[in-house]
Design a protein with these regions (language model features):
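Active-site core of metal-dependent hydrolases
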Residues: 66, 81-194, 202-203
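Active-site loop-helix segments enriched in His/Asp/Glu that coordinate
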Residues: 1-85, 99, 106-112
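Electropositive phosphate-/nucleotide-binding environments in soluble metabolic enzymes
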Residues: 10-14, 69-72, 103, 160-167, ...
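Residue-level detector of anion-binding/catalytic polar loops
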Residues: 26, 147, 226
Length: 232
């Protein structure tokens, strides 16, 4: 889930994943959403992962005006929920972190990893091509064992002039020595995309485009990336 954990529910996400499976599309979900405590199906991210086959991790939002500031202690608690849930199921439980535009960046993440470096491999920072700063923060996370997730639907037209084009962000990460296994790309497909005016007020709402994933994959190849690397 995203901003709306009130009128939208994790059970609806699970139902959609099950319907996609019936149509032949492999699907998994992450429990939780922007708010803390996390909206869940069974009362915790840990038990959601342990008891529900399709749940592979959790979600949280940091550095975003739509959530209260997240402390290192809160991040440690939520990441540990995902970790232990995965241990009970026999895989690595992941925590996807929505990264907003606030100036603190991933400071709470780095503070948490100072105390619990073993959690690094459970963390995915998403929307990191929203700005050069977010990208650099994600690169630091990768150095601590985490993953960077580039949003294929974010570009100058959809977010603003500081946005890194997804295919270019992937190429930049690889030039900087980020292992391709640590670089992800997702569409955020059909997720709400608010447009803001200069005064910070919401001027409109859109939805992230599923087709952007294919577009940026094709651009990676057109811009010189070997097909085998783009597919990874």
């Amino acid at each position: 889930l995203g901003t709306d954990g009130v009128t939208r529910h994790v059970d609806a996400v699970l139902a959609k994943a099950n319907s996609l499976e019936e149509e032949g599309v492999s699907s998994f979900i992450m429990s939780g959403g922007y708010p803390v405590p996390s909206p869940t199906l069974t009362g915790s991210i840990r038990s959601d992962i342990a008891f529900i086959e399709k749940v592979r991790g959790g979600k949280i939002a940091i550095a975003d005006h739509r959530v209260a500031p997240v402390s290192a202690e809160t991040l440690l608690a939520v990441a540990t929920e995902a970790r232990i849930g995965g241990m009970l199921r026999g895989f690595i439980g992941m925590l996807i972190m929505h990264i907003g535009a606030a100036a603190e960046g991933l400071s709470c993440v780095f503070a948490a990893l100072e105390r619990a470096p073993h959690l690094g491999r459970h963390l995915i920072a998403t929307h990191i091509n929203r700005s050069p700063f977010a990208f650099s923060e994600a690169a630091k996370l990768v150095a601590k064992g985490g993953f960077m997730d580039i949003s294929s639907g974010l570009n100058v037209q959809t977010l603003g002039p500081d946005t890194l084009k997804p295919s270019e962000a992937i190429a930049l990460a690889m030039r900087q020595g980020v292992a391709k296994e640590r670089i992800l790309m997702s569409s955020d497909g059909n997720g709400s995309a608010a447009r803001y005016g200069d005064d910070g007020s919401v001027s409109g709402l859109g939805a992230s485009d599923l087709g952007s994933l294919h577009t940026e994959f094709a651009d990676c190849v057109k811009e010189g990336m070997p097909l085998s690397e783009a597919l990874c």
